[in-house]
Amino acid sequence: MLALRVCGYAEHGRTQDAVRLLMNRQLPAGGWNYGNTAVFEQELRPMPETTGLALQALVGLVSRADVDKSIAYLRSELVHLNTPMSLAWATLGLHAWQETLEQPREQVRHVLARQKQLGPYDTASLSLLLLAWHCDAGLVRSLEQMQSGDEK
C-alpha cells in the first residue's frame, strides 16, 4: 500500500481495498495488531509497530477522526518503547499525522544504549530508526517530497 501510494496509485482500487481492510482491522479501543480484532470474543491488544505502520499507510486516505484513538494509543505507548523497530514505526506513524514527539533524542539514545546489555541491533532495524528520525513528515510524505524535488 505504501509503495502504491508513493508511485501515484492512491486512488487505485487495490489501494482503496487496502484502506477498507485496515480500517476494518482497527481495534475498537484504537491501534492495530497482526490480524483479527478479537479472538473468543476478547478484544486483542494493539501493537506499536503495526499501529505505526497502519497510521503511516492511512494518512491522507482517511480522516483524522477515523484514527484518533489509534494515535492516542501510540502516544501513550511511546514511553515504553525500547527497540529500534517499535520506536521507528511509532515515530513514522505519528509524524505522518503531524504529531511531535517529546524528547525524541533521549528516546533514541535510550534505545541505542540497550545494545550494551542486549548486543548489537541488526542493520535493518537501525536503518529504520534513522529513517524515522529524518522523516519528520512521515515516510509517504517524505518520499513524495523527494520525488517532486521538494526535499528539505
Segments predicted by a language model, with ranges:
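Amphipathic alpha-helical segments of tetratricopeptide repeats
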Residues: 24, 75-76, 112-113
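Protein-protein interaction modules outside structured cores
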Residues: 108-109
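An alpha-helical repeat/solenoid feature that recognizes helix-turn-helix modules
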Residues: 1-20, 28-69, 77-104, 117-152
